[in-house]
Amino acid sequence: MKRYVVGISGASGIVLAVTLVSELARLGHHIDVIISPSAQKTLYYELDTKSFLSTIPQNFHNQIVLHHISSIESSVSSGSNTIDATIIVPCSVATVAAISCGLADNLLRRVADVALKEKRPLILVPREAPLSAIHLENLLKLAQNGAVILPPMPIWYFKPQTAEDIANDIVGKILAILQLDSPLIKRWENPR
């Protein structure tokens, strides 16, 4: 069993976080979840609920720990604890900017800062379009420091039919980067 931190910032696309946390739990992993206040609002706007756990099958709840964004004393904030990877999905450009400047003023930003300084996997799923030169510079800076930048782009050659298909494909890409085995991971095969 591995331990993952999933940070959820206020960008649109919270279904990606729900899908990721559900699949990591289904695969038997421990997940520490940090939800920003803006993400709480997005959760309500996009999924009609104020409770993140209500979006996750109940049999997985014992594998998930919710951390308050101001709980800077949380165990996940320390580099002395083993976290296998940190994923921020969706990741707002405000969060990208803060992380790229080393601003660790809340738990979400702190865990990203720790991942970078400890050279642990950090996957950012920025949900913004179009991107300004400032956004691109911040993303470049993070990529140069070891973060994986994974924009949530649909994988059209798999011919998604629903929003759920698109979310599953994007989460499959995250899981592939984490080198996990999941039915959500699709591999291209040459057509015959």
Swiss-Prot record:
UniProt binding sites for FMN: G10, A11, S12, S36, S92, V93, A94, T95, R127
InterPro entries: Flavin_trans-like, Flavoprotein, UbiX-like
Pfam families to which the protein is assigned, alphabetical: Flavoprotein
EC numbers on record: 2.5.1.129
Keyword Transmembrane assigned: no
Record key words, sorted: Flavoprotein, FMN, Prenyltransferase, Transferase
Binding site residues for dimethylallyl phosphate: Y157, K173
Reaction(s) catalysed (UniProt annotation): dimethylallyl phosphate + FMNH2 = prenylated FMNH2 + phosphate
Gene3D superfamilies xrefs: Flavin prenyltransferase-like (3.40.50.1950)
One function term, GO molecular function aspect: flavin prenyltransferase activity
Annotated HAMAP family: ubiX_pad
Sequence similarity: Belongs to the UbiX/PAD1 family.
Protein function: Flavin prenyltransferase that catalyzes the synthesis of the prenylated FMN cofactor (prenyl-FMN) for 4-hydroxy-3-polyprenylbenzoic acid decarboxylase UbiD. The prenyltransferase is metal-independent and links a dimethylallyl moiety from dimethylallyl monophosphate (DMAP) to the flavin N5 and C6 atoms of FMN.
Name the UniProt record assigns to this protein: Flavin prenyltransferase UbiX
